[in-house]
Amino acid sequence: MDKNVTETTISANYGDFLLSAVEKAKDQFSDEEYKTLTADAEKIRAIEEQIAALAPADAAASSAAAQGTAFPQFEGSDLEGNPVDNSLFAGNAFTVVNFWFNGCKPCVEELDDLNALNEKVKAQGGEVVGINTETLDGSQQGIEAAKKLLATKGASYRNIYFASGSEAGKFALNIMAFPTTYVFDRDGNVVGQPLLGGIDKEENLAALQKNIDAALAKDSAK
């Protein structure tokens, strides 16, 4: 896994990262050690959730691209190896882009909701696209883990990756809170404010819908 991806993952959601790491290495610990490490990681995650609840807007603003900012040019692939680039935006009236990573519990919890949203917005000319930061640079370990999580949640919407050192990679790695979801217009420009948190929560879905409606209005006015 790319070093920058690891650093971003840990700083963004350390409790979830620890829980994931402990679970992967559970065979190396005694039952007592496993229970202790899991309990400690859960305490850290609980503290992080309390901190995040105090100032979620500040966390989003610290790494958010402003409205009208264009998504950087890129060439990459989806998780099945099919080539993809910025033309994906032009093919949609709007594109919902969700940034996530494998060890992020809130990210994984909303995967089925994102899949349902993708099915819904198809009729409006929209698409949901996922960008998992652990898959950047074509990391096979990250890709296989992401595909398993998506399959477990019954999610089949497109997920893509590109080089971490590209401008698009820097855009993704600049995000400091996960999950974060943007809406882009047909020209690849940000519409509204990014959404911090999962759309499995009603208020977050309402905020996302507001951005989608704005993108649709903009597209129909052309």
Where does each model-flagged region fall?
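Solvent-exposed loop/turn segments at secondary-structure junctions
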Residues: 101-106, 133-138, 163-168, 177, ...
